[in-house]
Amino acid sequence: AEFGINIRLFYYIGSLLNNIQGEKYIDACFKEIGTHILQGTLDTIQFHKECKIQKEEHTVCLPLRVNWGGGWSDTPPYCNENGGTVLNAAISLNGDLPVKVTLRKLKEEKIVFDSRDMDTHGEFTEIKELQNCSDPYDPFALQKAALLVCGIIPKKGNDLKEILHRLGGGIFMSTEVVNVPKGSGLGTSSILAGACVKALFDSVGITYTQEDIYDHVLC
């Protein structure tokens, strides 16, 4: 109840003020939603201290999604308060699965993200940079969140080089959505998150169910 009251208060006050101060309240509303979702998932996450990279390279390709009914009822904060039911179907694009994530083991102890469709590239050697995944303007927020929810890195503390040394090497993650524009309504962001989670689990040998994928993607 406190969550629902807080987000509504922030939103209504921000709407009434309708100025720079109001924008701060609107931002606070969405930050509250993000924190509620993230913490609810992160609190149940297990940091996999014993896992090791088991594949030199691994690629996951997934289809797009089209909604037949119930769209947005599964979207926070509505689904947090009321639940949600959506009827959808998986589709290919000209016979291809356009959502693609490739993981490759690196000799160097670092994390590298490469987004081909967004033309962005980033390299990380400090764990704090990877543990901050709440910035909506960060082009790699999704990839960082995948590392956290899969338990590859912990929520707080630790040393990235020690973790990667134990894993057996660094990680290169390439993400791409081929020939599908952002905002298409075909579920590219959530499906890309699912591909990242699935690729990470497969690469380090973590067993999972389809329900595990769904729960981790919600984060």
List the model feature ranges, each with a label.
Residues 189:
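Short, conserved phosphate/pyrophosphate- and ester-handling motifs at nucleotide-, phospho-/glycolipid
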Residues 195:
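Active-site signature of alpha/beta-hydrolase-fold catalytic machinery across serine-
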